[in-house]
Amino acid sequence: RVKYRKVFPNQPFEVLEMDIKFVWVEEYKMHCYVLTTIDTFTRIVLHWMVAYSIKKQDVKRAWEHIIINHLQPNNCLEKGINIEVRNDNDSRFSAKLIQEFFKENYLNQVFTHPYTPQENGHIESFHAILAKKLCPFTFWSIDELEGVLTLFYEKYNNERLHS
């Protein structure tokens, strides 16, 4: 469980947060899931994906991507960065497969307390920004949603000022 309600990381990759957002798609009259992982120090989105179904194996693949493309190139292990991964109690995050994968890769998974979005505040805030951006749209297909998300994430990571 989370020790501190708010996080104050001192460097990139110290505290990472992940969460899943739901977005309605008309094609099959159902929600799509958007999985996002953010670095709380830089506010950069390290990985995102959208699908009609996200399973624990998808979460693992997302973290394999983060490790290969972000953590390893920045020598996080060699630098001795104690990486904390904050997430809620979603069954995909609490699955034994994910917990073991995190341990094997020196990632310290921390679960937020129920009904305390402030403990995962950066990703919750990010998903609120995303919701506001997506609000005016009606998505007819997952491809249409993915196109809008691709532009949004690129602009968010590359054009906005990160505090």
Say what each PLM segment does.
Residues 20, 40, 89, 158:
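Residues immediately flanking
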Residues 34, 55, 59, 86, ...:
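Hydrophobic (often cysteine-bearing) scaffold residues that line and stabilize catalytic clefts
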Residues 63, 75-94, 117-120:
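Acidic/histidine-rich, metal-coordinating catalytic segments
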Residues 71-78, 159-163:
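Surface-exposed helix-capping loop/turn segments at secondary-structure junctions
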Residues 98-110, 115-163:
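Charged alpha-helix within mobile-element recombinases
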